[in-house]
């Protein structure tokens, strides 16, 4: 196996046993549910142990609230829609390793989707207010955009120098 690609839309739907197209239960669908986050972390950690790259496609890959978690988990590739590439690159570049690890430690101790989503939303709002822009916390290596695939690939880390 050369790589793992985590499809968060289906993973979340099947983990939560929720049809996101069914208005009676769609409100239960959330990638921020601790069960879904633990599965994502487990997949990425085990891919790393096996020497296999882990990528992610689906809405979560470009979600600003998910980015610190995915960086801390060690995600190698973010596959996002073309309209989200620039914003996702900027968001990735705004997180230091230390800060994303701290946020992830807090989140992984939480028990509910609401708790996780509120914490991440509040943290990111406060971070943006403190910095005024995303350029103050950078990673250490360049973020590369590969051709037209809209695949953001980590090469050792991120610093956003190619933005």
Where do the PLM segments sit?
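Non-catalytic helical/linker scaffolds that mediate oligomerization, partner binding
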Residues: 1-133
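N-terminal polybasic/positive-inside topogenic patches
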Residues: 134-139, 150, 157, 162
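Generic detector of N-terminal low-structure segments
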Residues: 146-147, 153
